[in-house]
Amino acid sequence: YGTQYEQLADCDVVINAAGDVKTSAKDRDGELFVTTDIARTWISRLFNAGFHGVIITISNPCDVVATEIWHITGYNPRKIIGTGTALDSARLRNAIAKRVNVDQKSIGAYMLGEHGNSQFAYWSNVNIAGKPLTQLAQDNPQRFTLDEDETEQDARRGGYRVYAGKECTEYAIAATAARLTQAVLCDEHYAAACSTLLTGEQGESGNYASLPCIVGANGVE
């Protein structure tokens, strides 16, 4: 095994997970200067060596780090992906599943925006087995009417609850990164909420945030 960043140049996917968990105990933004400084130490070396694969970045604040990597490299932004709210979306599906007593694999739901305190649930898109939650709530209000604010907050604060219990949150985000990596390596055209460069969506451009994306061999399609 090599020990130089340049030896990663032929990889199809490189995952950036550098950080300092102690600085993010209260807020994901706490790692800002640590993680962006670390990114600057290796990202140019990787690209100068000829890297042309996909970057998946976990490090927080996820959207800022992804944006910084894009600024440093000038690389195709579709091939720089932040895990963003992919994990938060899974937590939202879990929160809904517990409330309506349906397997979360049957639920379609996304958290969007910043991977942080301002993220929000895309409620108008939530469905169970393809049927909109709004319609289910009309048909069976006792079972399917949710406190949306409470449910959304459960998803938003999920990572902090895990950290409060064991002072780390590595397994779930590792599984999320692995799932996105699989989508790239197998060219799956997989749908996920992940952090990508905004190019006019909702009037915003030039920075990363999470939207529903299709992920394949060329990154975000």
What kind of region is each of these model predictions?
Residues 18-20:
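Conserved NAD(P)H cofactor-binding loop of Rossmann-fold oxidoreductase domains
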Residues 12-13, 54:
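Structural motif
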Residues 22-24:
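N-terminal glycine-rich phosphate/adenylate-binding segment common to multiple enzyme folds
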Residues 1-12, 26-27:
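Conserved N-terminal Rossmann-fold NAD(P) cofactor-binding segment
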Residues 15-16, 57:
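Redox-cofactor binding/interface segments in oxidoreductases and associated redox assembly factors
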